[in-house]
Regions:
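Positively charged n-region of N-terminal signal peptides that target proteins for export
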Residues: 1-8
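Bacterial N-terminal signal peptides
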Residues: 9-18
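Sec-dependent signal peptide cleavage junction
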Residues: 18-29
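ATP/NTP phosphate-donor binding region
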Residues: 28-108, 289, 306, 330
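Accessory alpha-helical/coil subdomains and C-terminal extensions
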Residues: 34, 40, 64-65, 70-75, ...
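Short Gly/Thr/Asp-enriched flexible loops that form oxyanion-binding sites at enzyme active sites
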Residues: 120-142, 283-292
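Internal gly/pro-rich beta-alpha loop/helix module
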Residues: 146-218
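ATP/nucleoside-binding phosphotransfer catalytic cores, i.e., glycine-rich phosphate-binding loops
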Residues: 281, 285-354
Length: 354
């Protein structure tokens, strides 16, 4: 009997030790990342201030990077943070010069072994464009994550603090290494190439069409299920170091009775054109005649959100298909292509691979 009691007591003590170990392992916050996350602030709604409780009529880009971080003290438990105020603007005022500054800053700071990743706070209107530009121009496998918000900081139930927290979690996660530039929004992780803003008001304003998100964040834990397959970051051939501007590319949108003379005007004032055609990149006969006469690179995209434009289905012989890129992302790739060889053969290759 005595041996039996001793055995039971020993078993109970062992179970208590196991239970205690499990609590310490799973019940405590994740260990703080040993590296540093650089938060690059550019403004946008996430830094917006307006009438208390309201979601409209606010001033974007009013709060600083330090203000945003101070509102989420839990971020300090994730990693050491360095804040950099790149600019403080509405994202509709983002320029190629700001893009180049972001790329230069990331490429320079990524060489610091203490830096583990980057978060860019940004307005949602043009977030997808900045993300794709950086996806093609930053030269690091370290995570680069964009985030923002649909509600200003002064609104009821502002979404910015959680989005910023989750973006830092992703930037500090090994799961995000080598995945290219990402967007983190409303618990979801999106690849830069496929992410797009799809709502003017919904806090779940980002989506990725037919491909969907590549992962999620849950209570600070990062789950990445897909790896982007198109060329990006360290494998990209584009080098923007030393550039202070980019070639000019205009986007034209075809519709019923759209004036074809707009094509001539745009061509005279641009280095290249992207045309958002109807359906699978189609136009009226009047547009086709003028497009065929243009002597600058022309990329054909679509007004449609999903689907692919292929070179064997183009109506104009001197154009190149955008594949699955939206008009605005096709314009970014064309602008970068125009910094080098912009032959039709090279453009076809780029739009298939990037």
């Amino acid at each position: 009997m005595k041996k039996h009691v001793i055995f039971l007591l020993s078993l109970l003590m062992a179970l208590c030790c196991i239970f205690s170990a499990a609590i310490s392992e799973n019940g405590e916050p994740a260990a703080r990342h040993p590296g540093k996350i650089v938060v690059l602030a550019t403004g946008g709604t996430i830094a917006g201030v307006g009438e208390a409780g309201k979601t409209t009529g606010y001033k974007p880009g009013a709060l600083t990077a330090e203000d945003l971080l101070a509102a989420v003290p839990e971020i300090a438990d994730v990693a050491e943070i360095e804040a950099v105020q790149v600019c403080n603007v509405n994202s509709d005022d983002i320029t190629a010069e700001i893009w180049l500054t972001l790329a230069e800053t990331i490429n320079r700071m990524a060489g610091d072994p203490e830096v583990a990743g980057f978060v860019i706070t940004h307005g949602t209107d043009t977030m997808e464009e900045t993300a794709y530009f950086l996806n093609l121009t930053v030269k690091t496998d370290k995570p680069v994550v964009l985030t923002g918000s649909m509600r200003p900081a002064t609104s009821l139930s502002a979404d910015g603090p959680m989005n910023l927290y989750e973006a830092v979690c992703v930037a500090a996660s090994e799961e995000a290494v080598g995945k290219g530039v990402l967007i983190v929004f409303a618990d979801r992780i999106y690849a830069a190439r496929t992410a797009a803003k799809t709502s003017t008001y919904n806090i779940m304003a980002l989506a990725a069409g037919e491909t969907g998100s590549i992962g999620m964040v849950r209570d600070g834990t990062v789950y990445v299920y897909e790896t982007p397959s198109r060329i990006h970051t360290t494998a990209s051939e584009f080098d923007v170091s030393g550039l202070t501007s980019l070639p000019k590319v205009s986007i034209l949108y075809f519709s019923v009775d759209a004036d074809p003379e707009l094509l001539r005007y745009a061509a005279e004032h641009s280095d290249g054109l992207v045309i958002a055609g109807a359906g699978a990149g189609e136009f009226s006969e009047k547009w086709i005649d003028i497009i065929n006469s243009l002597e600058i690179p022309v990329i054909i995209s679509s007004r449609i959100n999903d689907g692919v434009i292929t070179n064997d289905n183009l109506l104009c012989g001197n154009t190149v298909a955008a594949n699955t890129l939206s008009p605005q992302k096709a314009a970014i790739l064309l602008r970068l292509a125009l910094t080098g060889d912009a032959s039709r053969e090279r453009l076809e290759k780029l739009f298939l691979e990037y």
